[in-house]
C-alpha cells in the first residue's frame, strides 16, 4: 500500500500517480485494473509504455452478474407459470461447484442439466475461465472468437452484453497472458481495510483513516535504527 485517496475518481487516481517519481514510473511494466474507463485513461499519461491488464477476477464478476440477471428473469417467467424450479438456487449459480458440499453438489447437478437459460449463461461463464490458461496469444484469440460466437447466438442479452464488452477490451485481456497479474492483493487489502474501519467504529476524518491504513498495510520498517 503506497497511498490512499478519499474518492474513486480520475482526479483521485491522477493524484496517486503524482506521488511516484519519474524513476518509479519508468519501472512500471503493467497495471492491473478493472474496465472502468477513467482508470484506464489515467494510466495512459504517466506510464504510456505500460500494458493495461484487465483483472480476471473482475471479468469473472461481470460474467457472474450476467448469470444472475438471466436467472432472475427466468425465475420470474417460471414463477408466472407456477414453476418453482429456480427457487432458492441463486447461490448455486454464483459459487464455485468445487466448494460445494455433498447436498449442494447433488442439488446443483440436478438443476444445471435442465434445459434452462441460466444453465447456458453459467456454462458460458465457466467456459471463459479457460481463456486465462492459454500460453500463446494466437490460441487465446481463436478461443475468444469461438466463445464470443457461441454467446452471441445464445439469445441471452445479459451474457451477450458482457461478451461485447470483453470484445471491445480484448487487447487488454490478452496482456494477462504476458504478465499474469491480478488485483488479488488489492482485494485482500480492501478486506483488511474494512476490518480496520470496523474495529475503530468509523473515523472522524479521512486523515486519521489514511494514517491507520498506511500504518497497518504499508509494510513500514518499524525496526529501530
Q: Model regions: which residues?
A:
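A generic short-segment signal for beta-strand/edge and adjacent turn/coil regions
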Residues: 1-2, 20-23
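Glycine-rich phosphate-binding "P-loop"
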Residues: 1-11
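Residues at the C-termini of beta-strands that transition into short coil/loop
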Residues: 5, 56-57
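Glycine-rich, anion-gripping cofactor-binding loops and their flanking helix/strand elements
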Residues: 11-19
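Short alpha-helix plus adjacent loop in nuclease-associated cores
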Residues: 59-80
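Acidic/histidine-rich catalytic cores and adjacent linkers
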Residues: 14, 23-49, 57-60, 79-225
Amino acid at each position: 500500500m503506497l497511498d490512499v485517496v478519499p474518492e474513486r475518481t480520475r482526479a483521485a487516481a491522477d493524484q496517486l500517480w503524482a506521488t511516484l517519481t519519474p524513476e518509479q514510473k519508468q519501472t512500471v511494466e503493467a497495471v492491473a485494473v478493472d474496465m472502468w474507463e477513467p482508470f484506464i485513461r489515467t494510466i495512459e499519461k504517466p506510464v504510456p509504455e505500460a500494458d493495461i491488464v484487465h483483472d480476471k477476477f473482475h471479468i469473472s464478476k461481470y460474467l457472474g452478474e450476467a448469470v444472475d440477471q438471466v436467472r432472475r428473469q427466468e425465475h420470474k417467467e417460471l414463477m408466472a407459470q407456477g414453476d418453482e424450479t429456480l427457487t432458492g438456487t441463486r447461490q448455486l449459480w454464483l459459487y464455485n461447484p468445487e466448494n460445494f458440499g455433498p447436498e449442494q453438489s447433488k442439488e446443483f447437478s440436478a438443476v444445471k442439466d435442465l434445459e434452462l437459460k441460466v444453465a447456458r449463461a453459467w456454462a458460458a461463464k465457466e467456459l471463459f475461465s479457460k481463456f486465462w490458461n492459454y500460453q500463446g496469444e494466437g490460441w487465446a484469440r481463436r478461443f475468444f472468437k469461438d466463445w464470443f460466437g457461441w454467446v452471441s447466438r445464445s439469445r441471452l442479452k445479459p451474457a451477450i452484453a458482457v461478451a461485447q464488452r470483453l470484445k471491445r477490451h480484448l487487447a487488454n485481456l490478452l496482456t494477462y497472458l504476458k504478465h499474469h497479474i491480478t488485483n488479488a492483493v488489492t482485494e485482500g487489502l480492501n478486506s483488511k481495510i474494512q476490518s480496520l474501519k470496523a474495529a475503530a467504529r468509523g473515523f472522524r476524518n479521512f486523515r486519521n483513516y489514511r494514517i491507520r491504513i498506511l500504518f497497518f498495510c504499508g509494510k513500514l520498517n518499524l525496526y529501530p535504527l
